[in-house]
């Protein structure tokens, strides 16, 4: 059974959502603050985390940082704040999606399913083998990436994005192609999400992220991974 960890201090939102998730066949656990979320994750794990940005005490961004240090578990940020900077910060920390309150519980469950589908894609074209491009080596089956022999940690979306780029090394991929492949054709949003993930990837695979030579921008088109 797919487990969902709900980190939300508003019981009026968390409890009905947990009830609906259970009706839909998920295992749902609710915690109301950051330390409890980390303790529960360490105790039982989770297949996906719904994380409120505005938590009492330890913020959602700090919780996301701690989760990313532990795991590549998918994270959907949930918040009442609709500021673009909030979204960018959440995505830079490794969140896989971002939902603004008030939201439809059914819509949120659809997003959960979409994120889990993308994370569990078993298409053989995109799921097996060892890929190499320049200093980057990816073992797709083991979900391990190394740069110049040093292992790096990538959240799920960064891993998926890098895998698609590596499978198309030397080829220009448009922003639309990348978003459709990594976030899905039902993704609603702009290209800033992609650009944030590219920036994060560059910080991990480039010797000088400000002057990339491997993951390069093709002006007016998209991105290309050079071998």
UniProtKB/Swiss-Prot annotation:
One of its GO terms (molecular function) is DNA binding. InterPro entries: CheY-like_superfamily (IPR011006), OmpR/PhoB-type_DNA-bd (IPR001867), Sig_transdc_resp-reg_C-effctor (IPR016032), Sig_transdc_resp-reg_receiver (IPR001789), WalR-like (IPR039420), WH-like_DNA-bd_sf (IPR036388). Changing residue 29 to E: Does not affect phosphorylation by PknB. Does not affect transcriptional activity. GO terms for biological process: phosphorelay signal transduction system; regulation of DNA-templated transcription; regulation of phosphate metabolic process. The modification Phosphothreonine is found at residues 100, 191, 217. Changing residue 217 to E: Slightly reduces phosphorylation by PknB. Inactivates transcriptional activity. Significantly reduces the binding affinity of RegX3 for its target DNA sequence. The keyword Transcription applies. Phosphorylated by SenX3. Phosphorylated and inhibited by PknB. Keywords: DNA-binding, Phosphoprotein, Stress response, Transcription, Transcription regulation, Two-component regulatory system, Virulence. The modification 4-aspartylphosphate is found at residue 52. Transmembrane segments: none annotated. SMART domains: REC, Trans_reg_C. Induction: Part of the senX3-regX3 operon. The two genes are separated by a rather long intercistronic region composed of a class of duplicated sequences named mycobacterial interspersed repetitive units (MIRUs). Significantly up-regulated after 28 days of hypoxia. Changing residue 100 to E: Significantly reduces phosphorylation by PknB. Inactivates transcriptional activity. Disruption phenotype: The senX3-regX3 deletion mutant shows a growth defect after infection of macrophages and is attenuated in both immunodeficient and immunocompetent mice. Deletion of the gene leads to differential regulation of a set of genes involved in, among others, cell wall and cell processes, intermediary metabolism, respiration, virulence and transcriptional regulation. Deletion mutant is attenuated in terms of its ability to withstand hypoxia. Changing residue 52 to N: Cannot complement the deletion mutant. Phosphorylation by SenX3 stimulates binding to the target promoters. Activation of the SenX3-RegX3 two-component system is inhibited by PhoY1 and PhoY2 when phosphate is readily available. Overexpression of the kinase domain of PknB (PknB-KDMtb) inhibits the transcriptional activity of RegX3 by phosphorylating Thr-100, Thr-191 and Thr-217. Phosphorylation at Thr-191 and Thr-217 abolishes the DNA-binding ability of RegX3 and phosphorylation at Thr-100 likely prevents RegX3 from being activated through conformational changes induced by SenX3-mediated phosphorylation. Residues 128-227 bind DNA. One of its GO terms (cellular component) is protein-DNA complex. Homodimer in active state. In solution, exists as both a monomer and a dimer in a concentration-dependent equilibrium. This is Sensory transduction protein RegX3. It comes from Mycobacterium tuberculosis (strain ATCC 25618 / H37Rv). The gene is regX3.
